[in-house]
């Protein structure tokens, strides 16, 4: 059954019809195969924008470095990265004058936050490049392998608990003549094959110690792993994204926190706020511009698009920015903030899996790993790849990586780059001409408002803004930016026309079935519709249609049509039998073939609660029986989070209310993982989970209050248990023998 998404637009006012131009239903495109080509594209493009800069060879890594700052003055129409440092600093000076004390306060707050940040902050985050095994791992695992390897080199800062001592270790590690670390190696064993002649070669993952030289270690620490960005709609070509390693993460975190403190107090910044708060900020900006417009004058808005934002920015500009922002801070904090940009201006991009080539007879395929890209004759590649490799050659290192000193990778310094954009917007006017500009910036997206007495002066203002941005390394695209009278523009996928236009078509892909389990999917579906009514101006008739479409989709997904429907099938047989034997058929869940009772008034109520009072007692008993092996009470208590994928922008986390019943099952993890080197990771995770459960059993508040202190977990638990035992013994809740037994056990642990 194909559902026509246009049903959703029945009661939409005419200007909101923008929604109909986004018929994004269905699965977005995912990337397949190797991402090497996209990464090489990024490396080549980035260097092309900076190619007139100073070139030199790094004395540490031997890589080719390019520094475009203070390069030739930029030209119109060509994107370039030649930011002029004195212009950047002057723009920041003006920002400092306009917001007195903002830089000092932001630095002070960031410094105080850094002092109390613990190492475990680095466990937040998804994939992280792990230098010990040279591939991506979950952030927590990468941090763990780094800390255990650091201990082998007498670097024990992490044990103190704070982020600062751990970061000090990272700096010290870069000076060690060699680094010893644990890695995973596959040992091949020959075993006689059971069912045929000959041998089987079995790979056994082993944890082994290894050592690398200082230069090799520094190269790994500076490496960014690259992948292809998935699920991007509206583009023919995929593009590369990067993942930094643990050494860079801690320093980036502090710089981003500093920039966040500043963005929060800049009225032109679209970060770090979101949703309705961002809309309020936008509406205020529009109102302010219209009220400042000269009598009889004109106010224009440019919906802006920047060409290759990341590739034209430069870490050296960010270094200048952190130095300027932290000007009045203690020297240690200024040094700390300067490390991230310095590491980034020496970064090295890993190129991924390499290319596939076929033999001349087209019979055999072979994967050429990145270190060997230039070891085979170039004519073996197709023309496109050959052209790429020729351009890549000067920046290629023999390990199969590429030197990438200019440019930033996606999503690394969103806040700090926003500060740079806002600095350009804050200049407002050049040479006291008769226009004023202002605007909004959110990472690489911007909207520019210009007020002047007539259209020509407005255009002059826009051109001046364009050239101002050029001096900061920002390239506004003349082709993709367009200008309207103020009152109609788009900023971060929010469309404005005398107020925000309801734009729930963006959310259409997330109106489907989430695929967690029957119980959660129903809750998520209804919550999304509810949220769209609250936040995105979805009207009642539309919402009603959305409910019906969702229920249809849900029934098709889980093959659970109404008990009185004519649909056949294995599951329907069981459902029909249940339907026949049930008195209160309204009480059956939709997943059990019951009717849908959802309407606009009860979207916020979980289905089990909605139908609780009209269920047959025996059905209710089966559905909610705590001893029923399918009722996952422990795993589903209270509020749960789901990942929602809108058509635009990142995956969002969304809370929904969960009530556990027999439909709240959890799928088992894929068993095939048990024979890989990931197995150790799972065992470690289970070990951590047990430790944390033990700790929470001793300290009930640990689940909602972060424990602070310098004790190890073991000492803290032993101490707490001794206290509890003594209290129980003294109050008579515990016998003398039990008390002595408990004390003896605690003594055996070695902490008495």
From Swiss-Prot:
One of its GO terms (cellular component) is host cell nucleus. GO terms for biological process: DNA-templated transcription; symbiont-mediated suppression of host gene expression; symbiont-mediated suppression of host mRNA transcription via inhibition of RNA polymerase II activity; viral RNA genome replication; viral transcription. InterPro entries: RNA-dir_pol_NSvirus, RNA_pol_PB1_influenza. Residues 286-482 form the RdRp catalytic domain. It catalyses: RNA(n) + a ribonucleoside 5'-triphosphate = RNA(n+1) + diphosphate. Residues 249-256 are annotated as: Promoter-binding site. Gene3D superfamilies: 6.10.140.720. Phosphorylated by host PRKCA. Pfam families: Flu_PB1 (PF00602). It is found in: Host nucleus; Host cytoplasm. The keyword Ribonucleoprotein does not apply. It comes from the Viruses. Its EC number is 2.7.7.48. Keywords: Eukaryotic host gene expression shutoff by virus, Eukaryotic host transcription shutoff by virus, Host cytoplasm, Host gene expression shutoff by virus, Host nucleus, Host-virus interaction, Inhibition of host RNA polymerase II by virus, Nucleotide-binding, Nucleotidyltransferase, Phosphoprotein, RNA-directed RNA polymerase, Transferase, Viral RNA replication, Viral transcription. GO terms for molecular function: nucleotide binding; RNA binding; RNA-directed RNA polymerase activity. A motif (Nuclear localization signal) lies at residues 187-195, 203-216. HAMAP family: INFV_RDRP (MF_04065). Influenza RNA polymerase is composed of three subunits: PB1, PB2 and PA. Interacts (via N-terminus) with PA (via C-terminus). Interacts (via C-terminus) with PB2 (via N-terminus); this interaction is essential for transcription initiation. Belongs to the influenza viruses polymerase PB1 family. RNA-dependent RNA polymerase which is responsible for replication and transcription of virus RNA segments. The transcription of viral mRNAs occurs by a unique mechanism called cap-snatching. 5' methylated caps of cellular mRNAs are cleaved after 10-13 nucleotides by PA. In turn, these short capped RNAs are used as primers by PB1 for transcription of viral mRNAs. During virus replication, PB1 initiates RNA synthesis and copy vRNA into complementary RNA (cRNA) which in turn serves as a template for the production of more vRNAs. This is RNA-directed RNA polymerase catalytic subunit. It comes from Influenza B virus (strain B/Lee/1940).
